[in-house]
């Protein structure tokens, strides 16, 4: 068995109202920041999954992202593999 550490990033889908992103965008001029636009605010979850393979671990994370961590009607998610650790030889590979 190996451990796989993932990040799931969730953002409002394009065209969906993003009041937090809008509030940040409206605050930028008060900070003299003029080079930033189209701000989107979301959330990030990090999970460690123990599985026989990366494909099996990703399937678990995909299910959680779709069913628990996001609302597929109004949010999009992206899954990123951060780290993989093999329990057989304690090899650690950081991917980020």
Regions found by a protein language model. Name each.
Residues 1-96:
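Long, contiguous binding/interaction regions
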């Amino acid at each position: 068995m190996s451990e796989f550490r993932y990040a799931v990033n969730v953002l409002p889908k394009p065209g969906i109202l993003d009041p937090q992103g809008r509030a940040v965008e409206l605050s930028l001029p008060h900070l003299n920041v003029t080079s930033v636009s189209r701000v989107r605010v979301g959330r990030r979850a990090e999970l460690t999954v123990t599985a026989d393979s990366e494909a099996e671990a990703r399937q678990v994370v995909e299910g959680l992202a779709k069913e628990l961590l996001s609302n597929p009607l109004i949010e999009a998610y992206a899954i990123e593999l951060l780290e993989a650790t093999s329990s057989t030889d304690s090899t650690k590979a950081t991917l980020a």
